[in-house]
Structure formats: structure tokens, C-alpha cells
């Protein structure tokens, strides 16, 4: 039952409360950090109201650019829930960009990958140095997909990518074809294969790490082990 295998919230006590807690923590950090760092919110990279990213800049010249792509099964959330996750990198001198994107079912997963590539390119034009990609869940899929064959990420940007971190990422989308959420994702067999990094050759040379919680559900442990 793949619908159950990918249903996280119902297996976490009080799981429904977490998004509100994330948003509260993110807003609190932005308020506290505004005196230490430069915070540029909702920088547009495309025509849609969701085509924007938040950019957090350290004092002085950044050491490089860290990208964090949020999860939510391509169907929910936005960068405003995750601002506090920028603290570690920006405190160490890196710029951090968190892209937003149009959600399914308004677009398809392949469209989201293209949008995030555009957001990364936009931020990369503003910040010099190495690029470090990271993403959680669906975001983990996106960042690993962008570093595989057929990626929409421009070669000039791809060549700057030094590392990729996928946190509880989904690297083989074919099981999602058998889930109830696919009524919203609208994946077909061809797109599921084309957006599965595990089925594609890597693009360029970069350091790759996949992480999942030791107590996560078995399907997420399996997905992390695939790469």
C-alpha cells in the first residue's frame, strides 16, 4: 500500500500541528536575524505569484551560495515556513536562497524542476562562489534531479555546484503512481521515470549525501539508500 507508505503525518503524534510551528519559528527567526543579516524576501524570478525566492545574505562577501528547496510533496508549503533553517549557513558566511514554486495540480512535477532551476540561476547571478544544493522530501528529489542527465539547470550554473544534500528525498517516483496523491500530482509512467534521479546518469562531479531519520518509515529509508 504505497498510499500508506508515504503518509507521514498520521504516524507522527500531533503531526498536523507542525506546519504552524514551523511558520512561527521561521517568522521569529526572521525578526531576530533582521539586525544581523540582509533578508530579501520574495525576489521574483518568473511571472507567477509563486515564482519567487527568499535570499539571506551575511555580512561582507558571501563564501558561496546555499540553496534549500522545501518539501510538501510538490503540493503544499512555501519558503516562509523554513527561514530559520538558513541560520547555520548564513552565520558561517554563506548566502542562502530558498525558492518557491507553483504547486501541483496547477503544474506538473517536471515544470517544478524547471522553475527551481530558474530560481537557482537567478540567485547564482547575484552570488559568486560555489553552490551547495539541499532539499527536503520533494525538495530532495528536485535538487538531485537537477544534477542528473537532462537537467534544465544551465551548464554554467551546474559547473559551480560543489555538493548536493537530499534530506528524506524521493529519488524514485514510480511508486507514487500507485498513491492517492497522484490524483493531484498527475504523474504518468514516462514523467515518473524522467524525474527519478536514481534512473538517470549524474551530471558533472559533486559531493552527494542523502540523509533520513533513523526512525523514519521504511520507504523513506529505502529511497535514501537508492542513491
Predicted regions and their residues:
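Residue-level signal for short, function-critical loop segments
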Residues: 59, 72, 214-216
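N-terminal cap/lid segment of alpha/beta-hydrolase-fold proteins
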Residues: 5-60
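The feature captures the conserved acid-bearing segment of alpha/beta-hydrolase catalytic domains
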Residues: 163-177, 189-225
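Primarily recognizes the serine-hydrolase "nucleophile elbow" in alpha/beta-hydrolase
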Residues: 118-182, 192
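Short hydrophobic segments within beta-strands
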Residues: 56, 68-69, 134, 167, ...
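Short beta-strand element of the alpha/beta-hydrolase
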Residues: 63-72
Amino acid at each position: 500500500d504505497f498510499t500508506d507508505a508515504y503518509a507521514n503525518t498520521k504516524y507522527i503524534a500531533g503531526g498536523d500541528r507542525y506546519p504552524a510551528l514551523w511558520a512561527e519559528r521561521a517568522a521569529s527567526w526572521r525578526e531576530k536575524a533582521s539586525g544581523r543579516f540582509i533578508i530579501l524576501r520574495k525576489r521574483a524570478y518568473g511571472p507567477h505569484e509563486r515564482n519567487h525566492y527568499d535570499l539571506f545574505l551575511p555580512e561582507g562577501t558571501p563564501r558561496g551560495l546555499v540553496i534549500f528547496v522545501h518539501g510538501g510533496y510538490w503540493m503544499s508549503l512555501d519558503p516562509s515556513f523554513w527561514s530559520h533553517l538558513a541560520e547555520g549557513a548564513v552565520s558561517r558566511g554563506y548566502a542562502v536562497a530558498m525558492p518557491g514554486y507553483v504547486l501541483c495540480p496547477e503544474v506538473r512535477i517536471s515544470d517544478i524542476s524547471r522553475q527551481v532551476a530558474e530560481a537557482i540561476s537567478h540567485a547564482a547571478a547575484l552570488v559568486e562562489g560555489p553552490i551547495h544544493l539541499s532539499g527536503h522530501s520533494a525538495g530532495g528529489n528536485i535538487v538531485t534531479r537537477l544534477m542528473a542527465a537532462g537537467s534544465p539547470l544551465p551548464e554554467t550554473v551546474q559547473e559551480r555546484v560543489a555538493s548536493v544534500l537530499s534530506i528524506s528525498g524521493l529519488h524514485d517516483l514510480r511508486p507514487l503512481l500507485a498513491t492517492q496523491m497522484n490524483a493531484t500530482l498527475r504523474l504518468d509512467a514516462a514523467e515518473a521515470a524522467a524525474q527519478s534521479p536514481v534512473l538517470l546518469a549524474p551530471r558533472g562531479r559533486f559531493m552527494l549525501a542523502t540523509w533520513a531519520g533513523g526512525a523514519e518509515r521504511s520507504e523513506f529509508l529505502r529511497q535514501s539508500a537508492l542513491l
